[in-house]
Amino acid sequence: MNPFVIAIDGPAASGKGTLARKIAAHYHFHHLDTGLTYRSVAHALLQQGLTCDDETSAIAHAKKLDLNILNPNLLNAHEIGEAASKIATIPAVRKILVAKQRDFIKIPPGSVLDGRDIGTVVCPDADIKFYIVANIQTRAKRRYQEILKRGRHADYQKILADLKQRDERDMTRQQSPLKSAENAHLLDTSELSIEEAFAAACTLIDPLIKARAAL
C-alpha cells in the first residue's frame, strides 16, 4: 500500500505552511515545505554573490540539495523568498526539485507537502488536496507580524506590494503556475484561526485515513 499523501497549495502567506505542519504532526506524517527547496537554491546563489538568472549554478545547487538538511530559520528571509520565486521559473531547476519531492512522498506512513504546484504537478494523485486562500490584506498583515516577531523591521505597504507582484509572477509563469487542482478542497483562511482551519481540514482527512486503515 502506498504512503498517504496530502497536498496543500496556495499563495504566499495564505497559512498553508502552518496548516501543513499542524496536520503532519497530528497524523504523524512527514512534512515538506517545497518552497524551502527553491529557497535553499536561491540562498546558495546569493551566498556566492551570484544572480538568480545564473541557470548553470542554480542547476548545480539543485542537484546537490539534501531535503534532510533544509533549515527554515536560515531560509525565511524576505529577500531569499523573492529570489526563490525567480529561481522557480527555471524549468531545469523545477524538474530536478520536483523529482526530489516525488521521492519524498514514498516514505511511509505518509506525508504532507505544501507549495504552489503540489496538487497539480508534484502529487497529482495525492489522496487529498487543499487549496488555501486568504485576502491579500490578511496575508500582508500575517507576513508583517511574522517579520516583527523575528525582531526585524517591516513595512506593511512594501509587503503588500511585494505579495501582489509575487502572486502575479507565480500565477503567470510558464512552468507550473500557481493554481488550484480541479479536485482540491478550497479553504479560505481569511477569517479563520489556525485551529479552525485545522479542524476543517481534519474533517475531510479523517474519513480517508479510516478508510485506508480498514483495507
Curated annotation (Swiss-Prot):
InterPro entries: Cytidylate_kin, Cytidylate_kinase_dom, P-loop_NTPase
CDD domains per the UniProt record, alphabetical: CMPK (cd02020)
Entry's Gene Ontology molecular function annotations: ATP binding; CMP kinase activity; dCMP kinase activity
Keywords: ATP-binding, Cytoplasm, Kinase, Nucleotide-binding, Transferase
Catalytic activity: CMP + ATP = CDP + ADP; dCMP + ATP = dCDP + ADP
Chief localisation class: cytoplasm
Residues that bind ATP: 10-18
Coiled coil regions, renumbered to chain: none
Protein name per Swiss-Prot or TrEMBL: Cytidylate kinase
GO BP terms in the entry: pyrimidine nucleotide metabolic process
Family indicated by similarity: Belongs to the cytidylate kinase family. Type 1 subfamily.
Enzyme kind, highest EC tier: transferase
Cleavable signal peptide: none
Gene expressing this chain: cmk
Keyword Oxidoreductase carried by entry: no
Compartment(s): Cytoplasm
EC number: 2.7.4.25
Entry keyword annotation includes Repeat: no
One Pfam family cited in the UniProt record for this chain: Cytidylate_kin
GO CC, any one term: cytoplasm
